[in-house]
């Protein structure tokens, strides 16, 4: 009876998921491929990771995550471990060491989640410091994306891409322009106003100038005419924009600052994420993936005949203390701060910011201890089968949200696609993924990075911006997420200590401070 009830509930949830699936959710489900595919392909080529097993297992990760968290919680590779493995050489990782590194991180994060120490850590860490981490990581991702879209690396030559071809500069430039244009929030101000200038448009037309007669002859859209016209369907008053931003959630309590979040409110309320120009959402990530696959097949028609039906058998991990020690020291320890911060703490705070209007019972699904246990349990099962070590991440959540995902249906759909491809074609899919145009992946990665970096706009005060920028600058300058995070914490602690000392001194010698204030 229990199994029958569980099966009925599963079927009902599946029908509900299918009924509520929209093109925005479909597009959003593909928004994180700019991060996932390059690392996956690199590991398949470098350390002979099994592609079919990884697609199947990570697809199951996606399905479980969407089912459990009910938001577009992404599944990403553990980037530091992947980077160390791809670096190669004496300091690199082979496949067993890479898998043991993932087990090490999963075990540590699992202990933090089971003991709920991660919740205490989340409470102690100031949100501006976390947003500084997100700003730095987002900038790095966006820089990598632009570089991937426009430049060549490795091979016989490096530098700008050739103009034409599926890997050409034109493809990268057009993809970048299209992605930015279709994912920008809609306008929230009348053209020809100061608010419009803040949005990248033209401000009030200058009047005391010899060019005024010429400016009057310009089309209204270029700032000409006698008065700036009202744009139908796009002009939103500052008060309404603030209300929209407030309604879309923000800090841990679910509120965004009214003054700076007009763009977020307008984007989430009017289709800005994944829908450019203030209109309905355009499934830009879906279009990019379909176009990329079509270009790959047209460029190399023989790819289709290189695919082989049938899954590949998992290669079970054999426990080895030398491999565990090497993997933990080279890849696990550098990965641990990033997983703790970005895959647990930052993703929790970002989810609260994006989905703060959901009921408390729903928000408890993605509390830090639950996310930490999810990372531990998923890897604790999948790594033994030879799947790539994975975690959740703020960048992936931001990317899927940016391209239109709003529910857990997006990762469930992506998981079904990945698992189906892994079971149908196994490792033979690598020939198709290798042929996917890199400029399109770069464009996806750029938009994902920009969305993650823009989370800093949730900061409420200039003081918070200072701490966020200090953290981000330290991470970018030192090229180390953990060290930059510590710099941000030290900055917060130093300011708190200074203000505490000043307050204590003012209480101890009130007359001295009173005279100083009058002076």
Swiss-Prot record:
Effect of gene knockout: Decreased nitrate reductase activity due to a reduced molybdate uptake. No effect in strain 704 due to the presence of a second molybdate transporter.
Main location: membrane
Transmembrane segments annotated in the record for this chain: 98-118, 164-184, 370-390, 412-432, 436-456, 464-484, 485-505
Induction info: Up-regulated by nitrate, but not by molybdate.
Inhibition and activation profile: 60% inhibition by 20 uM tungstate or by lack of glucose in the medium, but no inhibition by sulfate.
Organism domain of life: Eukaryota
Keyword line: Membrane, Molybdenum, Transmembrane, Transmembrane helix, Transport
Molecular function, one GO term: molybdate ion transmembrane transporter activity
Subcellular location: Membrane
Annotated membrane topology: Multi-pass membrane protein
Record's GO cellular component terms: membrane
Described purpose of this protein according to its UniProt entry: High affinity molybdate transporter. Acts through an energy-dependent process.
Name the record gives this protein: Molybdate transporter 1
